[in-house]
């Protein structure tokens, strides 16, 4: 997910995406603890996507 794609989305879409990404991260961490996670880079990628969304929201002045 690129920053330009995120900047085109509305604030509501970004907040929904943030909620979805955080749930995905929890799920990935659970899979890692159980030992079923095969792609260990997925956690890092998800964290970076969360950071990108938060950056765009903060640029808009949205407090979270």
Curated annotation (Swiss-Prot):
GO terms for biological process: translation. Keywords: Ribonucleoprotein, Ribosomal protein. InterPro entries: Ribosomal_protein_uL29, Ribosomal_uL29, Ribosomal_uL29_sf. Coiled coil: none annotated. One of its GO terms (cellular component) is cytosolic large ribosomal subunit. GO terms for molecular function: structural constituent of ribosome. It comes from the Bacteria. Pfam families: Ribosomal_L29. SUPFAM superfamilies: Ribosomal protein L29 (L29p). NCBIfam families: L29. Belongs to the universal ribosomal protein uL29 family. This is Large ribosomal subunit protein uL29.
């Amino acid at each position: 997910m690129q920053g330009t794609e995120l900047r085109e989305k509305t604030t509501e879409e970004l907040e929904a995406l943030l909620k979805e990404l955080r749930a995905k991260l929890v799920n990935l961490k659970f899979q890692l603890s159980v030992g079923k996670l095969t792609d260990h880079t997925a956690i890092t990628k998800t964290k970076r996507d969360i950071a990108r969304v938060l950056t765009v929201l903060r640029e808009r002045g949205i407090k979270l």
